Amino acid sequence: MDKVETQTSRTQFAFVRLDITPPEDIYHGLWGAAAQHAATGIHKNIFADILVFQKLGDSSQSVIMILLDHVMFEESQQEMIKEKVQNISDNLKILVTFSHTHSAGFMYSDRVKFPGGEKINPYLELTRDNIKEATKKALDQLEDVTITFEYGQCGLATNRDYKDRKRDQFVCGFNPEVIPDQTLLVGRVSDANDRILCNLVHNCSFHKLPLV
Protein backbone atom coordinates (compact mmCIF):
# COMPACT_ATOMS: atom_id res chain seq x y z
CA MET A 1 0.00 0.00 0.00
CA ASP A 2 1.37 3.39 -0.98
CA LYS A 3 2.01 5.81 1.84
CA VAL A 4 2.07 9.60 1.49
CA GLU A 5 4.25 11.42 3.99
CA THR A 6 2.49 14.48 5.39
CA GLN A 7 4.48 17.28 7.00
CA THR A 8 3.08 18.36 10.35
CA SER A 9 3.94 20.63 13.26
CA ARG A 10 2.56 20.69 16.80
CA THR A 11 2.31 24.04 18.54
CA GLN A 12 -0.01 26.36 20.41
CA PHE A 13 -2.01 28.65 18.17
CA ALA A 14 -4.83 31.19 18.11
CA PHE A 15 -6.50 33.15 15.33
CA VAL A 16 -8.66 36.29 15.57
CA ARG A 17 -10.07 38.25 12.63
CA LEU A 18 -10.73 41.97 13.09
CA ASP A 19 -12.74 44.26 10.81
CA ILE A 20 -10.56 47.30 9.97
CA THR A 21 -12.71 48.86 7.24
CA PRO A 22 -11.90 52.61 7.07
CA PRO A 23 -14.50 55.39 6.74
CA GLU A 24 -16.05 55.39 3.29
CA ASP A 25 -14.84 58.92 2.51
CA ILE A 26 -11.21 58.46 3.60
CA TYR A 27 -8.36 59.41 1.24
CA HIS A 28 -8.10 56.84 -1.52
CA GLY A 29 -5.96 58.34 -4.30
CA LEU A 30 -3.53 55.45 -4.63
CA TRP A 31 -3.31 55.61 -8.40
CA GLY A 32 -1.67 58.54 -10.14
CA ALA A 33 -4.49 58.54 -12.69
CA ALA A 34 -7.21 58.63 -10.01
CA ALA A 35 -9.92 61.17 -10.84
CA GLN A 36 -10.68 61.88 -7.17
CA HIS A 37 -8.94 61.78 -3.80
CA ALA A 38 -11.61 60.60 -1.35
CA ALA A 39 -13.42 57.27 -1.61
CA THR A 40 -17.15 57.41 -2.34
CA GLY A 41 -18.24 54.10 -0.81
CA ILE A 42 -17.27 50.65 0.42
CA HIS A 43 -17.38 47.66 -1.92
CA LYS A 44 -16.25 45.05 0.64
CA ASN A 45 -14.94 45.22 4.18
CA ILE A 46 -11.24 44.69 4.90
CA PHE A 47 -9.73 42.78 7.81
CA ALA A 48 -6.74 42.28 10.06
CA ASP A 49 -5.90 38.67 10.86
CA ILE A 50 -4.07 38.12 14.16
CA LEU A 51 -2.16 34.82 14.30
CA VAL A 52 -0.38 33.76 17.50
CA PHE A 53 2.15 30.91 17.67
CA GLN A 54 3.72 29.58 20.87
CA LYS A 55 5.86 26.51 21.52
CA LEU A 56 4.21 23.68 23.41
CA GLY A 57 5.10 23.89 27.08
CA ASP A 58 7.06 27.12 26.62
CA SER A 59 5.33 30.46 27.25
CA SER A 60 8.57 32.46 27.27
CA GLN A 61 7.88 33.87 23.81
CA SER A 62 4.90 34.20 21.48
CA VAL A 63 5.13 35.02 17.78
CA ILE A 64 2.43 37.48 16.68
CA MET A 65 1.66 37.78 12.97
CA ILE A 66 -0.52 40.77 12.07
CA LEU A 67 -1.83 40.43 8.51
CA LEU A 68 -3.41 43.64 7.20
CA ASP A 69 -5.65 44.16 4.17
CA HIS A 70 -3.73 47.24 3.05
CA VAL A 71 -1.27 48.02 0.29
CA MET A 72 1.45 49.12 2.74
CA PHE A 73 2.16 51.45 5.68
CA GLU A 74 5.13 53.69 6.33
CA GLU A 75 7.80 52.08 8.49
CA SER A 76 7.00 54.47 11.34
CA GLN A 77 3.31 53.51 11.13
CA GLN A 78 4.25 49.83 11.36
CA GLU A 79 6.47 50.53 14.36
CA MET A 80 3.58 52.26 16.15
CA ILE A 81 1.49 49.10 15.71
CA LYS A 82 4.31 46.97 17.10
CA GLU A 83 4.84 49.32 20.06
CA LYS A 84 1.13 49.28 20.88
CA VAL A 85 0.98 45.47 20.84
CA GLN A 86 4.32 45.15 22.64
CA ASN A 87 2.72 46.91 25.62
CA ILE A 88 0.83 43.67 26.29
CA SER A 89 4.02 41.78 27.13
CA ASP A 90 7.77 41.90 26.57
CA ASN A 91 7.65 38.27 25.44
CA LEU A 92 6.12 38.99 22.04
CA LYS A 93 7.88 38.79 18.69
CA ILE A 94 5.74 40.81 16.29
CA LEU A 95 5.58 40.71 12.49
CA VAL A 96 3.36 43.02 10.41
CA THR A 97 2.58 42.05 6.81
CA PHE A 98 0.23 43.28 4.08
CA SER A 99 -2.03 41.67 1.49
CA HIS A 100 -0.97 44.57 -0.77
CA THR A 101 -4.46 45.31 -2.01
CA HIS A 102 -4.70 48.54 -3.99
CA SER A 103 -8.34 48.99 -2.98
CA ALA A 104 -8.15 49.90 0.70
CA GLY A 105 -6.99 53.50 0.73
CA PHE A 106 -3.53 55.02 1.00
CA MET A 107 -2.56 55.87 4.57
CA TYR A 108 0.76 57.67 4.14
CA SER A 109 1.37 60.74 6.29
CA ASP A 110 1.90 63.03 3.29
CA ARG A 111 -1.69 62.33 2.17
CA VAL A 112 -3.37 64.07 5.12
CA LYS A 113 -3.53 67.39 3.26
CA PHE A 114 -5.77 65.98 0.54
CA PRO A 115 -9.57 65.47 0.65
CA GLY A 116 -10.29 62.61 3.04
CA GLY A 117 -6.76 62.77 4.39
CA GLU A 118 -7.88 64.25 7.71
CA LYS A 119 -9.37 60.83 8.52
CA ILE A 120 -6.10 58.93 8.11
CA ASN A 121 -4.53 59.51 11.54
CA PRO A 122 -7.74 58.91 13.56
CA TYR A 123 -8.30 55.72 11.56
CA LEU A 124 -4.76 54.48 12.20
CA GLU A 125 -5.01 55.25 15.92
CA LEU A 126 -8.30 53.36 16.24
CA THR A 127 -6.88 50.47 14.22
CA ARG A 128 -3.85 50.21 16.50
CA ASP A 129 -6.07 50.12 19.59
CA ASN A 130 -8.31 47.45 18.07
CA ILE A 131 -5.34 45.34 16.98
CA LYS A 132 -3.99 45.42 20.53
CA GLU A 133 -7.32 44.24 21.96
CA ALA A 134 -7.62 41.53 19.30
CA THR A 135 -4.11 40.33 20.13
CA LYS A 136 -5.03 40.11 23.83
CA LYS A 137 -8.06 38.03 22.87
CA ALA A 138 -5.92 35.73 20.72
CA LEU A 139 -3.39 35.21 23.52
CA ASP A 140 -6.23 34.19 25.83
CA GLN A 141 -7.45 31.65 23.26
CA LEU A 142 -4.17 29.76 22.70
CA GLU A 143 -4.70 26.03 22.30
CA ASP A 144 -2.77 22.96 21.18
CA VAL A 145 -3.02 22.45 17.42
CA THR A 146 -1.61 20.41 14.59
CA ILE A 147 -0.52 22.24 11.44
CA THR A 148 -0.47 19.99 8.37
CA PHE A 149 1.32 21.58 5.44
CA GLU A 150 2.66 20.92 1.98
CA TYR A 151 4.52 22.75 -0.75
CA GLY A 152 3.13 23.27 -4.22
CA GLN A 153 3.44 25.54 -7.24
CA CYS A 154 1.50 28.63 -8.33
CA GLY A 155 1.91 29.69 -11.94
CA LEU A 156 0.25 33.11 -11.59
CA ALA A 157 3.50 34.95 -10.92
CA THR A 158 5.48 36.59 -13.70
CA ASN A 159 8.42 38.96 -13.76
CA ARG A 160 7.48 42.52 -14.72
CA ASP A 161 10.94 44.14 -14.92
CA TYR A 162 11.32 44.07 -18.69
CA LYS A 163 14.51 45.34 -20.29
CA ASP A 164 13.69 47.52 -23.29
CA ARG A 165 16.83 46.97 -25.34
CA LYS A 166 16.01 49.67 -27.87
CA ARG A 167 15.91 52.30 -25.14
CA ASP A 168 18.41 50.48 -22.92
CA GLN A 169 16.25 50.81 -19.82
CA PHE A 170 13.98 48.72 -17.61
CA VAL A 171 10.24 49.28 -17.93
CA CYS A 172 7.25 47.93 -16.00
CA GLY A 173 6.17 45.17 -18.34
CA PHE A 174 5.98 41.40 -18.76
CA ASN A 175 9.42 39.81 -18.93
CA PRO A 176 9.20 36.24 -20.29
CA GLU A 177 12.95 35.70 -19.85
CA VAL A 178 12.80 35.47 -16.04
CA ILE A 179 11.01 32.69 -14.16
CA PRO A 180 9.90 34.00 -10.73
CA ASP A 181 9.66 32.04 -7.50
CA GLN A 182 6.44 30.03 -7.90
CA THR A 183 6.67 28.16 -4.58
CA LEU A 184 3.35 27.87 -2.79
CA LEU A 185 2.99 26.74 0.82
CA VAL A 186 -0.43 25.75 2.15
CA GLY A 187 -1.33 24.61 5.64
CA ARG A 188 -4.32 23.44 7.65
CA VAL A 189 -4.60 24.22 11.36
CA SER A 190 -6.66 21.69 13.35
CA ASP A 191 -7.46 21.50 17.06
CA ALA A 192 -7.33 18.42 19.32
CA ASN A 193 -10.76 17.31 18.02
CA ASP A 194 -9.61 17.60 14.39
CA ARG A 195 -11.75 20.70 13.90
CA ILE A 196 -10.24 22.99 11.26
CA LEU A 197 -9.48 26.41 12.76
CA CYS A 198 -8.13 28.03 9.62
CA ASN A 199 -6.19 27.44 6.41
CA LEU A 200 -2.90 29.15 5.64
CA VAL A 201 -1.54 30.16 2.24
CA HIS A 202 1.94 31.62 1.90
CA ASN A 203 4.08 33.04 -0.90
CA CYS A 204 1.67 33.25 -3.74
CA SER A 205 4.26 35.52 -5.33
CA PHE A 206 2.40 37.81 -7.67
CA HIS A 207 1.52 41.49 -7.49
CA LYS A 208 -2.25 41.72 -7.07
CA LEU A 209 -3.72 44.41 -9.32
CA PRO A 210 -7.27 45.18 -10.40
CA LEU A 211 -8.08 45.38 -14.08
CA VAL A 212 -8.34 49.07 -14.93
Stretches found by the model and what they are:
Residues 1-97, 101-212:
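Conserved beta-alpha junction segments in alpha/beta enzyme cores
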